[in-house]
Amino acid sequence: MPAIMKGWIDRILAPGFGFNPITKNAYDTGFFKGKSAMLVTTTGSPKEMYSEGGGHGDLNKHLESITHFFFEFMGMKVLPSHIIYEASSMSRERGAEELEKYKKSLLDI
């Protein structure tokens, strides 16, 4: 996990900010109820490597630990993750296409 993400998680999940351990404000009664969250990530490998049976396993299953234990825990609605595969080797044209797909996914929220 990147250090910047770990720092964000530590601040968000500080007792009294992201949840309250005394009043048990979590999941359906979380402080962030009514908010939405989307994970956006890139990979260096092809999509096939991140599918069930692929070398790395289903990426969406790996991301569930973040979406469930952080976003859902705080009461957020989890939106589908936006994943860009093979980002390190993409052409400018494909980069522009991926950017348009990402813009569309944001506009469709």
Where do the language-model regions lie?
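Glycine-rich phosphate/pyrophosphate-binding loop and the adjoining helix
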Residues: 49-109
